[in-house]
UniProtKB/Swiss-Prot annotation:
Main location, first listed in the record: Golgi
Molecular function in Gene Ontology: ATP binding; ATP hydrolysis activity; microtubule binding; microtubule motor activity
Species in which this protein is naturally found: Bos taurus (Bovine)
Cellular component terms per the entry's GO annotation: cytoplasm; Golgi apparatus; kinesin complex; microtubule; midbody; nucleus; spindle
Summary of the function given for this chain in its UniProt record: Mitotic kinesin required for chromosome passenger complex (CPC)-mediated cytokinesis. Following phosphorylation by PLK1, involved in recruitment of PLK1 to the central spindle. Interacts with guanosine triphosphate (GTP)-bound forms of RAB6A and RAB6B. May act as a motor required for the retrograde RAB6 regulated transport of Golgi membranes and associated vesicles along microtubules. Has a microtubule plus end-directed motility.
Stretches assigned to the Kinesin motor domain: 63-506
Name of the protein described by the UniProt record: Kinesin-like protein KIF20A
Gene this chain is encoded by: KIF20A
InterPro entries: KIF11-like (IPR047149), Kinesin_motor_CS (IPR019821), Kinesin_motor_dom (IPR001752), Kinesin_motor_dom_sf (IPR036961), P-loop_NTPase (IPR027417)
Pfam families linked: Kinesin
Alphabetized UniProt keyword annotations: Acetylation, ATP-binding, Coiled coil, Cytoplasm, Cytoskeleton, Golgi apparatus, Microtubule, Motor protein, Nucleotide-binding, Phosphoprotein, Protein transport, Transport
Modified residues (Phosphoserine): S7, S14, S21, S527, S531, S667, S683, S823, S865, S876, S881
Modification N-acetylserine occurs at: S2
Phosphothreonine sites (modified residues): T855
Database matches in SUPFAM superfamilies: P-loop containing nucleoside triphosphate hydrolases (SSF52540)
Length: 888
């Protein structure tokens, strides 16, 4: 028989057949009444009759089962004082977690964050005293019964490392877990009803493939190669009976105790006592009643794979010489259901074969030693059991039911794994578990808020993609939470409890009727619309409609009836089109309104953004201008300083040149004449320069005198300040006398220079010329001394003026307080402003501004009071006296 993928026939389901598709309400999104495009292809392989559906609760929904199991403490843990009462079972459904003193939750509670006690509700809680058999009978047994009736179930364990997950799934040789007990229950319940030959093999997610005799032989050899622990397929050329005999003598033995005392996995042959115990275990008469037709047969196939570091590996891969394992791909079929490509499905005839294949897969699984478990599984392992329901001779497409048991890897802190592969494994495990939590949270959010459906991130992890079919309607799921009561793992246990609390709030949607209306329903509806009299007949004979609806033969209808059906369908189609058009118009209006609102919001945001950018740019450029001003000020100050230094250097060079000229005087009358002429010209030039400076000094003195006179006129102090004014006037008169003396001395200096010039013209002797120059130098020195004395006198006058101005301001302030006149308030403000510069030292601006290089300063036009002018005059620095004659 050629290999081929079976597709469902066209008339497999009747018009009124009810298709039960249990799924989370959150994923359904109120689309239960919408007819799917390819309904028959979706429901032909996996379908459930009306009698197989579960009874919903009172509100029409059924919550996801979440069971919790607490493992007992080990003697070593009791010695480490791990029993601090942090896990307390209050009743069969409520668990209380009390934070121990060294936990992070307790420290957060002491800082006022969070709480120390948390309570969680589960479907049922099992304490440490509950055995494997009791746990299986109270939880998984009903699910196995549903699988035998045609439903799909996913059972997965969740918990921290070393919490008993693997023990719950697989158990030990003496006390099996839910997986071996499920296998035993399935095979014990289906005794005598198993299909003898594996001519149908599961393919993709919910399809089957026909196998010919050669392919059946290859499947048997593959299974024997796995059961015999590494023999090549070429060596298995003996008959099936002999192979089965060899299979009964050889095998592997594995003790799974990962959750209690660390997983101890050994690939060795079982002893005779162990074989007897296993045979006795499979012979237990634990069955469930299965009411099936007499010609119905079952074919059971199993697969076993793991997800390690986000890579898929087949654990039932035949042995080969290659050291590197082949990775598998996760694909989707034409209906969008995920499946593992090239995954090995092994046909099993009894529970013993399935148990041995499980041990072979466990031998290939990834294990490693961690700080919590000496032999911890570092991957998510998924063991799937598919049951093909074969009707008759197997020519009809079978119905497929599946039971998947997933042993999730334990969540663990990455900081406990310092580096290397363990750190990478822990990171991938935590990432996949976190993605699973996000998917469950999104499903719960969609369930609570049906108007706003969020995207469920199934594709963010390989684990969630494998679970996607069970979360979106292809089956049901159940969570078993394993809790470690140790105080050192309380924070991780609290996180696990919070995760399971979200999962416990998910619900399954009730069965939804999917199918097309029958022809008779159209006929009945059209008849009622055509003749109202038929409505009475329909009411009087309700059984007639039921009999008509049960008929499925279209050939019994006449042409007129079929035309009526066509007319009714046209009317229904027109009505649906009008409804869809109305919905389209409504949606377009809503979308346009939303777009307009979004554009307005966008425009407002852009304007606000531009204003903000404008303010930021203004501040930025103001700062840049300030920095530029400071840099220019510092630059020009440095330039002025360099100029002063150059002037000093030139003066020093000039002094050295004069000394050298005096030391090396040439002999002869010509040299002396030339030298005298040169000195005369230099003296004449200096005389003109001094004369110009003298004129500038006169102008400056005149302006200063005028300013002092203005100050005297503007200052009209009270009578109490007259003694101070008299003293100031005396000192000013003395200063003016000194100025007059200075002027007379300057005139004498000019006359002496003129006489020296005339003497130089008549007397060519070098000695007389030197005497004239010495006389000029003496006169210049005296002039410098006079100027210095005058400057000191002016300084004293300024100090007295400061004191008197302060006294005048205080007296004015006192008078204004006493009189309270409004006309003097402005003058009081000016006095207060003029008092502030008294705190600053006077500036270094020279009094005789024309003698030194200076930059023009801007006078303040805001304050022109006499007090402000007096204060501005204080800022002029003291004039440094220097030898004018030596400079030139």
């Amino acid at each position: 028989m050629s290999q081929g993928i079976l597709s469902p026939p066209a008339g497999l389901l009747s018009d009124e057949e009810v298709v039960v598709s249990p799924m989370f309400e959150s994923t359904a999104a109120d689309l239960g009444s919408v007819i799917r495009k390819d309904l028959l292809s979706d429901c032909s392989v996996i379908s459930t009759s009306l009698e197989d559906k579960q009874v919903p609760s009172e509100d029409g929904t059924e919550k996801v089962k979440v069971y919790l199991r607490v493992r007992p403490l080990l003697p070593s843990e009791l010695e480490r004082q791990e029993d601090q009462g942090c896990v307390c079972i209050e009743n069969m459904e409520t668990l209380a977690l009390q934070a121990p003193k060294d936990s992070f939750a307790q420290k957060s509670n002491e800082r006022g964050i969070g709480q120390a006690t948390h309570r969680f509700t589960f479907s049922q809680i099992f304490g440490p005293e509950v055995g494997q058999a009791s746990f299986f009978n109270l939880t998984v047994k009903e699910m196995v019964k549903d699988v035998l009736k045609g439903q799909n179930w996913l059972i997965y364990t969740y918990g921290v490392t070393n919490s008993g997950k693997t023990y719950t799934i697989q158990g030990t040789i003496k006390d099996g877990g839910i997986l071996p007990r499920s296998l035993a229950l399935i095979f014990n319940s289906l005794q005598g009803q198993l299909h003898p030959t594996p001519n149908l093999k599961p393919l993709f997610s919910n399809e089957v493939m026909w196998l010919d005799s050669k392919q059946i032989r290859q499947e048997e050899l593959k299974k024997l190669a796995l059961l015999n622990g590494g023999l090549q397929e070429e060596e298995l050329s003996t008959s099936l009976k002999k192979s089965v005999y060899i299979d009964s003598r050889m095998g592997t033995s594995t003790s799974f105790d990962s959750g209690i005392a660390g997983l101890s996995s050994s690939s060795q042959f079982p002893s005779s006592s162990q074989l007897d115990e296993m045979s006795h275990r499979w012979a237990q008469p634990d069955t469930v009643p299965v009411s099936v037709p007499a010609d119905l047969r079952f074919s059971i196939w199993i697969s076993f794979f793991e997800i390690y570091n986000e890579l898929l590996y087949d654990l039932l891969e035949p042995p080969s010489q290659q050291r590197k394992r082949q990775t598998l791909r996760l694909c989707e079929d034409q209906n969008g259901n995920p499946y593992v490509k090239d995954l090995n499905w092994i046909h099993v005839q009894d529970a013993e074969e399935a148990w041995k294949l499980l041990k072979v897969g466990r031998k290939n699984q990834s294990f490693a030693s961690t700080h919590l478990n000496q032999n911890s599984s570092r991957s998510h392992s998924i063991f799937s059991i598919r049951i093909l329901h074969l009707q008759g001779e197997g020519d009809i497409i079978p119905k497929i039911s599946e039971l998947s048991l997933c042993d999730l890897a334990g969540s663990e802190r990455c900081k406990d794994q310092k580096s290397g592969e363990r750190l990478k494994e822990a990171g991938n495990i935590n990432t996949s578990l976190h993605t699973l939590g996000r998917c469950i949270a999104a499903l719960r959010q969609n369930q609570q808020n049906r108007s706003k459906q969020n995207l469920v991130p199934f594709r963010d992890s390989k684990l969630t993609r494998v679970f996607q079919g069970f979360f979106t309607g292809r089956g049901r799921s159940c969570m078993i939470v394993n809790v470690n009561p140790c105080a050192s793992t309380y924070d991780e246990t609290l996180h696990v409890a919070k995760f399971s609390a979200i999962a416990s709030q998910l619900v399954h949607a009730p069965p939804v009727q999917l199918g097309f209306p029958s022809i008779h329903s159209f006929l009945k509806e059209h008849s009622l619309r055509a003749s109202p009299s038929l409505e009475t007949g329909a009411k009087t004979d309700p059984g007639l409609g039921d009999d008509i609806e049960n008929e499925v033969d279209i050939s019994t209808y006449g042409k007129e009836e079929l035309l009526q059906v066509v007319e009714a369908m046209k009317a229904l189609l027109l009505k649906e089109r009008q409804e869809k058009l109305r919905l389209e118009v409504q949606l377009r209006d809503e979308i346009c309104n939303e777009m307009v609102e979004q554009m307005q919001q966008r425009e407002q945001w852009c304007s606000e953004h531009l204003d903000t950018q404008k303010e930021l740019l203004e501040e930025l450029y103001e700062d840049k201008l300030t920095i530029l001003k400071e840099s220019l000020t510092s630059f020009y100050q440095e330039e002025l300083q360099e100029r002063d230094e150059k002037i000093k250097e030139l003066e020093a060079l000039l002094q050295e040149a004069r000394q050298q000229q005096v030391a090396h005087q040439p002999s002869g009358s010509e040299l002396s004449l030339r030298r005298s002429q040169r000195l005369t010209s230099v003296s004449t030039q200096q005389f003109h320069e001094i004369k110009a400076k003298l004129e500038q000094c006169k102008a400056e003195l005149n302006s200063t005198t005028e300013e002092l006179q203005k100050y005297q006129k503007m200052l009209e102090p009270p009578p109490s300040a007259k003694p101070f004014i008299v003293d100031v006037d005396k000192k000013l008169e003395e200063g003016q006398k000194n100025i007059r003396l200075l002027r007379t001395e300057l005139q004498k200096l000019g006359e002496s220079l003129q006489s020296a010039e005339r003497a130089c013209c008549h007397n060519t002797g070098a000695g007389k010329l030197r005497q004239a120059l010495a006389t000029c130098d003496d006169i210049l020195i005296k002039q410098d001394q006079t100027l210095a004395e005058l400057q000191n006198n002016m300084t004293l006058v300024k100090l007295d003026l400061r004191k008197k101005a302060a006294c005048i301001a205080e007296q004015y302030h006192t008078v204004l307080k006493l009189q309270g006149q409004a006309s003097t308030k402005k003058r009081l403000g000016a006095n207060q402003e003029n008092q502030q510069p008294n705190q600053q030292p006077p500036g270094k601006k020279p009094f005789l501004r024309n003698l030194l290089p200076r930059t023009p300063t801007c006078q303040s036009s805001t304050d022109c009071s006499p007090y402000a002018r007096i204060l501005r005059s204080r800022r002029s620095p003291l004039l440094k006296s220097g030898p004018f004659g030596k400079k030139y």
